Each structure stands twice: as structure tokens, then as C-alpha cells.
Amino acid sequence: MKKLLLIVLAWAAMVPASRGAPISRDPYLGAIVLDANTGAVLFEDGADRPGYPASMLKLMDLFIVLDRVKQGSVRLEDPVLITKEVSSIGGSQVYLDPREKFTVEELVYALMIQSANDAAMALALHVAGTRDGFVRMMNEKAKELGLSPVTQFQSPHGLPPGAGQRPDITTPRDFAKLCLALIRAHPETLKYTSATFRVFRQEPLFEMRTHNRLLGNVPGCDGLKTGYFTDAGFSIAATVQRDGARVIAVVMGSVDRKVRDAKATELLGRYLLDASRTPAPPPAPAVRTPPAASAAAAPAVATDDEAQGEDLPDPDADEPAEKSGGWLKSVGLVVLGAFLAAVVGMAIQRRLLLGR
């Protein structure tokens, strides 16, 4: 009986105490939290480790576009020419066609909500004339913002590099600086990064839905951007404002989307309590925005939710779904725990009876 009891206790020790244990064990490559009112660092862990930003870098695209709008060289209502180079981009997209015309602002929404790589390329060509010219603008802006030499942009979209190409590189600290500067220079940024849904085209119908699951789930969250491809892991730049305090968190290189989102939520909530408070307007509401104008016919495509899959070269829409069978494992653990508890109870009761 003693041997049986020892075996049962050993098995019980092997049952995980919590399904969330991996979050605290190895949640990310690096992370940082900034006080948006003062710029002070409230938390950092591996904040200078270089990693791949993936689609998060589209916030730099937005920065450059909004800079040009403020300067007057670009208008939000300007029509954007769609070229074959634009329509051949893979990954997450809105499937732009050379027969179509969309405005700068419509493509900005596609950039932030759908994480559309074709929209990123279209905006890059519209602003700079060439892809390489826009990438130069990105790196010049990085220097202007005082980002470290580690941060190097090689593309307007953040897709995995092809043969002979170099990857986009940044650090959590540099990217948090970028986000802070973007919000300060262009408060209207939050109008785009807080949008969770928008109809991009009417015929055939194409609806865009955000990849940022913190929106609508974390009170006060109004941005900013997620990123993912296989080698990059799951990353997010997020911001929350409550009661005059605002914090920005960047989490890079998580091995799982849920781990990334849980860690970002934890950091935002914890360090918002330590942030300075100044009078500020309420956060931008994450509301359904009006549909874009109808464009020329485009091929019917699957929605982003239907295009999940880790093998796709897509920095956001390929966030793989949770593996099937997770609920069965949970039920199995519960049943195993109940069985072990019953066996232990019977063993103890038998020992007491024998001892009388």
C-alpha cells in the first residue's frame, strides 16, 4: 500500500499546476513599457535584443504617410495608382487590382486593420515613387527619431525576406520610441489603430477585421499593431489610456499569440498604475467605420479568418489557431486529477482501518 501511495503521489506531481505556466516561464524575446506622458521606462526585460518586427513596422509606414499629409505633399483623399508590382504582393492583403482606385486614407485603414501588404506597397510607391526610395525614408526617419543603429528597415511590409534579401530588424526599446513619437506627432494615429472593422470593397464584398485582439477586450486600448511570421514569433505594440494616464507596451518574439496577448495585457494593466496622469481626452473609440467606396470588380477572396495557417508567408493573418484537442487535454487532466484524488483517499482510509 505504501508503494501504491508513493506511485500515486508521483503521478500527481507530474500533473501541471496551471495551464498558463508557460506565460511566466518564457513569454517573449524582449519587452518594454513606456509612460507616454513622460517617456519614462516603467519596465524593461531584454529591451535591446534585436528581433524581427514583422507587420509592426507598418506603423513606420503610417508615420511617413502622416508626415507627408501634415506637410501638404500628400492628401488623404488623393487617389492611389495600383500597379502590377502592388497586386503581386503575398501574405495578408486586400487583393488590390490595377483596375481599381482607392484613396490614401482607405489604404491607411487597410494597412492598420487588415495589415495589408499590398496597401503598404501602394502607399510606398505613391509617396516615394519607388520601393527602395520609401525604405530610405523609413531609415532616415529612424535616425531622426534617435533609434539605435540596430534598427534597419528593408521593406515597407515586414514580410520574411526572400533569397538574397536582408530582414527588417529592430528592438523593443527602439520600437516603443517609434510608437511614442508617432502618437505625439500624429494623435490621429489612434483613429486608425483603434478601428476593428471596416468594409474595404462592396463588390465582391471584402470586410477587414483587426488582428489586435486587445482592442475591445482591454479597457482603454486604442492601438497599435501586431506582427508575426514563423521566425519572428508573435509581437505586438499596444497602448492603453485611462484616467489621464497612457502607457505603451512592446512585446516581441513570443512563441504563441495567446502568450503574447496575455503578457501585453498584464504589462499594460500593471504599469498603468505607475504612470503619470495628465488631463487628456478619452481614448479613441474602437467603432465600426463606414464602408469604403465601391471599386472596380475584384476577384472573390477568402476573408482573413478563413486564410489562417502557419505556412503562409503572412506577418499577421497567418497567426496559427490553437491546436485542436486542447479542450480534450484539459478534460483529461481534470479526470486524471479526480481519479488520483480518489485513489489517495482510498489508500488513506484503508491504512486507517488496518491500524485499528
Model segments located where?
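Sec-dependent signal peptide hydrophobic core
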Residues: L4-L9, G332-L336
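Hydrophobic h-region of N-terminal signal peptides that target proteins for export
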Residues: L6-S18, A341
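Generic hydrophobic alpha-helical segments
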Residues: I7-W11, R68, D118, P149, ...
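Active-site-adjacent loops and short helices of periplasmic peptidoglycan-processing enzymes
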Residues: S18-R173, I183-R184
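Domain-terminus/edge residues, biased toward the C-terminal soluble/receptor-binding domains
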Residues: L147-S148, H157, A163-G337, A341-R356
